[in-house]
Amino acid sequence: MVDKLTHLKQLEAESIHIIREVAAEFDNPVMLYSIGKDSAVMLHLARKAFFPGKLPFPVMHVDTQWKFQEMYKFRDRMVEELGLDLITHVNPDGVAQGINPFTHGSAKHTDIMKTEGLKQALDKHGFDAAFGGARRDEEKSRAKERVYSFRDSKHRWDPKNQRPELWNVYNGKVNKGESIRVFPLSNWTELDIWQYIYLEGIPIVPLYFAAEREVIEKNGTLIMIDDERILEHLSDEEKARIVKKKVRFRTLGCYPLTGAVESEAESLTDIIQEMLLTRTSERQGRVIDHDGAGSMEDKKRQGYF
């Protein structure tokens, strides 16, 4: 029967199976919602998994307060339209210290507002499993991570201490204080994601589509002028270099740390065609991935998703 399914239907069935397994095995799961395309697909799959009922777990957004404005608008619209049980968490310590990506740099901003914020939220609500939309094709440390990614009581990941996963059998045993991060989209590619969004009609943030936007090039990365805060950290010479270009985003994060790409792709079919021809990683525009050799693995060892 499986052999008669299309490639995307096989991926869909695998992801739904994983989501249902976690809901059945764990006492208090949560689905992380970063508002991006992978989160949109994962949320769609979860709703399919339990249709016509509601999700048996909440969704949670760890807010750095530096997401694109269109992302916040989209999040609020989805919560209202889908009736989601949304938890938002902002690291109060980071807010008190005034942490931001300009003054403190990408590494410290990510550690305090994302990693520590996530760990705070998981501890506060006692979640023992957290769904995430990471895929193995994104980045080398994610490529070697299991679907069930076990974390110790400090939320740390040890890549040398992973359990075997045979076929579709997952070992969900955890000791008190431990938890897992689970990745239902592990075996999907960026192209799979876009084709599935097209076929299923899944809503996504408009920033994924090419449009004329104000940007400034910093260290080879096109940074979008999303709100007034960025202007406070630009010199007069830099402000003079702000230009309008037709750009879109292949990945979405904190806007000062996420680069746009020049593109003509204004529709889903345009994006799919672009994906068939591209030879660069979607995360080439993520500044945090360039903090140092092995930076993503180091972040994950400390509790980053």
From Swiss-Prot:
Gene Ontology terms: biological process: hydrogen sulfide biosynthetic process; sulfate assimilation
Pathway per the UniProt entry: Sulfur metabolism; hydrogen sulfide biosynthesis; sulfite from sulfate: step 1/3
Alphabetical list of Pfam families matching this protein: PAPS_reduct
UniProt gene name: cysD
Molecular-function annotations in GO: ATP binding; sulfate adenylyltransferase (ATP) activity
InterPro entries: PAPS_reduct_dom, Rossmann-like_a/b/a_fold, SO4_adenylTrfase_ssu, Sulfate_adenylyltrnsfr_sub2
General function of this protein: With CysN forms the ATP sulfurylase (ATPS) that catalyzes the adenylation of sulfate producing adenosine 5'-phosphosulfate (APS) and diphosphate, the first enzymatic step in sulfur assimilation pathway. APS synthesis involves the formation of a high-energy phosphoric-sulfuric acid anhydride bond driven by GTP hydrolysis by CysN coupled to ATP hydrolysis by CysD.
Subunit (UniProt): Heterodimer composed of CysD, the smaller subunit, and CysN.
Protein name (record): Sulfate adenylyltransferase subunit 2
Organism: Pseudomonas fluorescens (strain ATCC BAA-477 / NRRL B-23932 / Pf-5)
Reaction equation(s) it catalyzes: sulfate + ATP + H(+) = adenosine 5'-phosphosulfate + diphosphate
EC number: 2.7.7.4
Family: Belongs to the PAPS reductase family. CysD subfamily.
Keywords: ATP-binding, Nucleotide-binding, Nucleotidyltransferase, Transferase
Enzyme class of the recorded protein, top EC level: transferase
Disulphide-bonded residues: none
PANTHER family per UniProt: SULFATE ADENYLYLTRANSFERASE SUBUNIT 2 (PTHR43196:SF1)
